[in-house]
């Protein structure tokens, strides 16, 4: 894994292209979603714009929510690599389902994309971070290159999928299908290049077996122990994850119920079911879940001070960046 491509490790460029094709598929599909619903739908009468935006809002909200779950699953059970592979496969199937342009397959496709994104998005970034655990000074350049792939994929996806999707000679099936084809390319590339990562991204249950078979331990693959970097050891949990999860789930549910009550007290009762779910249920579900998730983390008594401070920093930054992404996602909705 010694760096020999622009001074970076070859594994970084595997992740670069995998993420690039995933972002191609995401933004390529997104640019077509609302336009397809208001112009074509499923061969019946097109949707009202308000309904299309409501569906887009539900989809986008869940796309941003599910990575919290996907990250936990990867950390505790799957490992980052398996999560990325599973997410890429599920998203490929989702794009294929949407390309059929049938109502049931369209909704199934959106559901698969939401689930796949939750598994894929947080965990490929985690693999990028682990590449330079023993060389933290190189991480800035590492992530700069990685995000160049994100931007390149988004640009190409928007250009090509919109061209084929809105072309009279091709149609929306080709636009949605093209997104799936490039997601499949990313999946295949990552699957066959796994050997280059060493032990990085393996599931917790696989690490001991890998180290025993190679005799490498943490020295291979760039993973460093805390003492090797002169850092405090990472906390291992307080053994109360289950009770804390239940307690904060209850708190999150109560908060969600309060937010729901406030929303319906100001809302027009005549809106249809889709808009009702988008406006009444999605905000409290997301807000309640985020509060429960954050509370579950910060209430861990085993957290070191440096870890707790970093968690609070993430929470503060996340709050303010919400407004950026809220405006950014209008590109696929109200600005389409």
State the predicted function of each range.
Residues 1-10, 134, 165-336:
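Intracellular loop-helix junctions on the cytosolic face of multi-pass helical membrane proteins
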Residues 30-31, 68-69, 152-167:
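A gly/Pro-rich, aromatic-decorated transmembrane alpha-helix motif that marks the paired
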Residues 53-74, 121, 155-157:
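Central cavity-lining transmembrane alpha-helices of secondary-active solute carriers
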Residues 1-27:
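Cytosolic juxtamembrane N-terminal segment immediately preceding the first transmembrane helix
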Residues 86-107:
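C-terminal ends and interior cores of transmembrane alpha-helices
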Residues 76-88, 135-136, 307-308:
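Cytoplasmic membrane-interface "Motif A"-like loop-to-helix N-cap segments
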Residues 31-53, 271-275, 331-336:
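Short amphipathic helix-loop junctions that connect adjacent transmembrane helices
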Residues 94, 105-120, 318, 322:
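Hydrophobic core of transmembrane alpha-helices in multi-pass small-molecule transporters
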